[in-house]
Amino acid sequence: MNVLRLNLTLALLICLFGSAVSQDLHFSQHFNSPLNLSPGLTGVFNGDYRVTGSYKSQWKTVPVDYLTFSGAVDIKLDQYGSKRGNLNLGLLFDYDQAGDLELSLANIAGLASYSFRLNKKNFLTPGISMGYNQRRLKPGNATTGNQWNGFEFDPAIPAEVPFVDNNSFVDFSIGANYRHQKGFRKFYDLGIGLNHLFKPSQTFEDAPNYEADLARRWSIYGMLNHALGSKLDLILNAMYQKQDPHQEILLNAQAKIYLNKDSERDLAVHIGLGARLGDAWYPMVALQMRRLYVSANYDINYSDWKNKTNGRGGLELHVAYKFAKVPPVMFKPCPIY
């Protein structure tokens, strides 16, 4: 009986804390959640204000499905800018939940960056973010060895769990983005992001007797938009990400087809394919109507995990809207498109 109790408790702790340590947001369309990718992407867009939202539902066919949501807003502060650069601020909210214990993470972060205009075509934007995070779980959903009454499992006996149900911590991230831009439809970005700079503790124990620091996450990325013709653009995205022993490579290619290029009725569709190497691939489609952008993709697992998911990874949705003020006649903004 004591051996059974010990084994069940150990199994619970391994599953619980293993998930807690490795859990971080993962969007297949990483390029459509820019403030999660790097604080250096704060304010790097065509317009004055940007609002974005992202949603992902993964692995509905298995008991431990994941739900992820992210929302952000970032702005360019022209009054603190000059012909040499521009100050940008952002606000980010993230939430995800997974598993029978409903392990969740809520994060709200403030971001700041400054876009330095190196010359007419080149821009460098370093950025930083500070966030308040709270992890929660429901110990009442746990089952442990003490619920064995000698004959059978008895759910009426409260589970004995050696941890609290929440943990809060402050988290910092830094990053930088470099943009080379020849025109509205010809530019590329190269950048880096470093999340969990000071490796905050995320243990659920009252008196921690093991390390549960959140490992630093490095992201290195590249994004390209290149006009192939008057009504066709090629878009390429790539990212390498590493967090402790875990790493991944994401690739994406799109054709952007302009259906109407009139400034008042600007309309384009994106058709693309992407992959998370070694795990899944996905088809994607997007619609851009002037300053509104909506995209969707569906992950299809091809790794060994497909035996559990039947290949159905999950749906991912993104939406973005960019606002633009009409500047005074003599005003010349930082020309990041």
Per-segment meaning from a language model:
Residues F17-S22:
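Sec/Tat signal peptide C-region and signal peptidase I cleavage site
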Residues M1-L8:
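Bacterial N-terminal signal peptides that target proteins for export
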Residues Q23-Y337:
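Subset of outer-membrane beta-barrel
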